């Protein structure tokens, strides 16, 4: 849904961001991540959604907080796609169930245990 041409929740329009978006949950992490961008600018803040843009090696990038949980992340991603994004990197804490994974480890997941309802709207439960 658009309000004055802007996405309802993230408050941006098509063309405000490029293809690549980093997604932390916590809005406070956005500025910390944006400090690594060339020419960072905060372009929106509404509720749990904070958005910064900049570039890395000349490539436009953005960082957008998603808040907590699947529903708010889905809202952010769907609105970001409407504005031109197509590649996302989720960053932040998560839980684990094996002793071999320690705090501070970087994990690139190939699957997950999903015990919530939002992801079922996007992927089969077997994924």
Predicted region positions:
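Metabolite-binding pocket within alpha/beta catalytic cores that recognizes anionic/polar moieties
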Residues: 1-127
